[in-house]
Amino acid sequence: MRNTFGPSRSMLALAIALAGLAGGCNDSGGPRDNQQDAPASAPQNVFVPALSADENSLVLVWEKPESETEQVVDYAVYRQGQRLGQARENQNHFSPAKPYIDNFYQRVASDGWQQKIDLRSFTATNLQPDTEYAFTVRAVYADGKESPDSAVIKARTSKTPHIIEASTFGAKGDGTTLNTQALQQAIDSCTVAHYPQGCKVLISGSEFKTGALFLHSDMTLEIAAGATLLGSDDPAHYPLDKGYYLYPYSDHPQPRRPPSLINVLEAADKGESPAGTFRNIRIVGQGTIDGNGWTRGVKSGGEATIIDEMGNALPQYRASNAKKVGADGILAKHQTEAAIAEGIESNSAYKNRRSSLMTLRGVQNLYLAGLTIRNPAFHGVMALESENITLNGLVHQTFDGNNADGVEFGNSKNALVFNNFFDTGDDCVNFAAGFGKGAETFHQQPQSGAWIFNNYFRKGHGAVVTGSHTGAWIENVRAEDNVMYMTDVGLRMKSRPYYGGGVRDVLFRHNAMKDIAKEPFVFTIKYSADVNDTTPADEPAQFRDVQVQDVTVDGTSAKHSILIDGMTVAEMAESFGVTYSRDAYHQNLRFSNVSFRNTKATNISFLHDSQFDEVTFANTPQAWAFFAVNDVTLADSLHQQSITREENDKIILEGAMK
């Protein structure tokens, strides 16, 4: 069987997702049916992400032209025919990733070898409230000429909201007063019933200490520049009875977790809430949310702050685990110790009783922008069973906190992640979809639809990561035009066979990677860092229909440039006591125009019906290693062959050079 997977399937799936993101709310970007078809040489699918419009600004994003007759170097944005500016200059003011991306190409990777990336967002400012505007976008060529106009997109700013200052309810920004009650009262009073024009809770000033807070539909929480929302270090301020279950499973019930610092949860959470349970929530501002999870310094005696490649200060948090949390943690220590005092086993207490920064469940239309996210006791931002989610211009500073993912999407639909800076203690952007038979029994929805672009991934276990919870499938993910520098992995897919489901329809293109600490590409079902008891799925997990295109990788210090693994029926039976009817293998992976330099060799097994077209290596002897593969095609200047090998019949081949 030959691989027939191409970009059209993934492109179509993403187009459907983008339509949902644009039509999320009438007040934050008009639905896309006001557009006409644009010429192929013009930018495509211009839209305003749901809830990205406020009373005086809005955000535009778009896709590349379908065809480029000339080299595109930038994009120009027009409002009612008046030129507002160009995307790259605009991002200097609104994207924390942009200066790092510029520095990467100017200083870190200055020899011109790396894949260049496109920047495709624009923040329009100085707008009037409750006013409709018409925008078009043009591609700008190297000679300064411009493409035809995109289709016109019409979008309306929001009405001017009523503003509730947190201080009016007695909140004090002195860093010591516990403000939970005052802040919650401000939030509870901020309703459309009281303020039909919309309502915003504003936290401004200095450092506001608080326990768990709970948001509701149709509101904005803004943390102003200079203000910090600091998590209390007292477990009692995150009451377990207000917490949540990760999944609704009954065969192997999940333990209840405490609430996060910021929450959107039903009062009696049962492990699932459909999107639309809550609606239209914005969490924005130029301030900071600090979870107060860990002490400073990656190790004891280590630097609390380092100076990064841009000369900026980056906080460093303790790399720890269940055995060392008592010495290393703050909130993480106190929550774990409190759970152990209740009689919970120490590893379970550590895994299940630490608070994340945000747990946002069942939200239709969710917008996060501008904030700095720091030091969670557990995860960073978790968006569960939600729909139409945008993360724009966040700064994630959680390195090297244990389990400190940047953002995790679970069983959600339609996500946009752009202009973010990631320096995280775990995965930067992670996707999850349940595990085991429970994903089918409880009819969990797949994690479906994501567009990840124009981000700077600095540190993290993986930049773009799927799994290990793959039970209901993770699908329709596009990651393009990102820079990945010093992450452990670039594209990481992970699961365990009995978790089931898998990952499908992924497009990873036009990304630049440098100094990757481990593997640039990982596809593994032998993930062992997160083991959960579960009734096994009917079929073993699988990764399929993945396209990697126009990517450069310069430098890996430790492991394989591409790692793909699986397991035989016998291995799964021996390791997990589960007998499946087939091996756990992957299929329809296509790498095209991918260049490696100064990397380790590949290690590829349990792969079927896949292609490697114009994949080149510099300074990597014997770059290809295949075994237990079926109909894998190599097509480059050295090879034109299809490879099929048994498990004990490894073939080693030299790699082509560019």
Regions found by a protein language model. Give the residues of each.
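Bacterial N-terminal signal peptides that target proteins for export
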Residues: R2-L12
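Extracellular/periplasmic carbohydrate-active domains that bind, remodel
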Residues: N26-K658
